[in-house]
From Swiss-Prot:
GO cellular component: cell outer membrane
Native organism: Escherichia coli (strain K12)
Alphabetical UniProt keywords: Cell outer membrane, Cytolysis, Disulfide bond, Host cell lysis by virus, Lipoprotein, Membrane, Palmitate, Signal, Viral release from host cell
Bilayer topology annotation: Lipid-anchor
Pfam hit, one: Rz1
Protein name: Prophage outer membrane lipoprotein RzoR
Lipid group attachment sites (S-diacylglycerol cysteine): C20
InterPro entries: O-spanin (IPR010346)
Subcellular location: Cell outer membrane
N-palmitoyl cysteine-type lipidated residues: C20
UniProt KW Lipoprotein keyword: yes
Length: 61
Protein backbone atom coordinates (compact mmCIF):
# COMPACT_ATOMS: atom_id res chain seq x y z
CA UNK A 1 0.00 0.00 0.00
CA UNK A 2 2.84 2.32 0.87
CA UNK A 3 4.49 1.60 -2.47
CA UNK A 4 1.23 2.47 -4.28
CA UNK A 5 0.98 5.83 -2.49
CA UNK A 6 4.59 6.60 -3.33
CA UNK A 7 4.01 5.68 -6.98
CA UNK A 8 0.93 7.96 -7.16
CA UNK A 9 2.86 10.80 -5.58
CA UNK A 10 5.73 10.41 -8.04
CA UNK A 11 3.30 10.34 -10.99
CA UNK A 12 1.33 13.37 -9.81
CA UNK A 13 4.33 15.56 -8.99
CA UNK A 14 5.23 16.40 -12.63
CA UNK A 15 1.61 17.32 -13.36
CA UNK A 16 1.51 19.70 -10.40
CA UNK A 17 4.84 21.29 -11.30
CA UNK A 18 3.84 21.81 -14.94
CA UNK A 19 0.45 23.21 -13.91
CA UNK A 20 2.02 25.75 -11.58
CA UNK A 21 4.71 26.93 -13.99
CA UNK A 22 2.72 27.23 -17.22
CA UNK A 23 1.13 30.58 -17.99
CA UNK A 24 -2.32 30.77 -19.46
CA UNK A 25 -2.59 32.84 -22.59
CA UNK A 26 -4.94 35.79 -22.35
CA UNK A 27 -6.97 36.47 -25.46
CA UNK A 28 -7.40 40.04 -26.62
CA UNK A 29 -10.84 41.58 -26.36
CA UNK A 30 -12.56 41.71 -29.71
CA UNK A 31 -14.16 45.06 -30.45
CA UNK A 32 -17.72 44.54 -31.69
CA UNK A 33 -18.55 45.95 -35.12
CA UNK A 34 -20.54 49.18 -35.28
CA UNK A 35 -24.32 48.78 -35.50
CA UNK A 36 -25.92 48.79 -38.95
CA UNK A 37 -27.21 52.09 -40.27
CA UNK A 38 -30.88 51.04 -40.22
CA UNK A 39 -30.75 50.65 -36.43
CA UNK A 40 -29.58 54.24 -36.04
CA UNK A 41 -32.52 55.67 -38.04
CA UNK A 42 -35.66 56.81 -36.20
CA UNK A 43 -38.49 54.27 -36.12
CA UNK A 44 -41.15 54.60 -38.83
CA UNK A 45 -44.40 56.37 -37.99
CA UNK A 46 -47.13 53.76 -38.42
CA UNK A 47 -49.76 55.72 -36.50
CA UNK A 48 -50.41 58.39 -39.16
CA UNK A 49 -51.16 56.01 -42.08
CA UNK A 50 -53.30 53.82 -39.84
CA UNK A 51 -55.38 56.79 -38.68
CA UNK A 52 -56.54 57.28 -42.29
CA UNK A 53 -57.65 53.64 -42.55
CA UNK A 54 -58.92 52.94 -39.04
CA UNK A 55 -61.03 55.66 -37.50
CA UNK A 56 -62.45 55.91 -33.98
CA UNK A 57 -65.92 54.51 -33.41
CA UNK A 58 -67.48 58.00 -33.77
CA UNK A 59 -68.23 57.46 -37.47
CA UNK A 60 -71.33 55.33 -37.95
CA UNK A 61 -72.19 54.07 -41.43
Amino acid sequence: MRKLKMMLCVMMLPLVVVGCTSKQSVSQCVKPPPPPAWIMQPPPDWQTPLNGIISPSGNDW
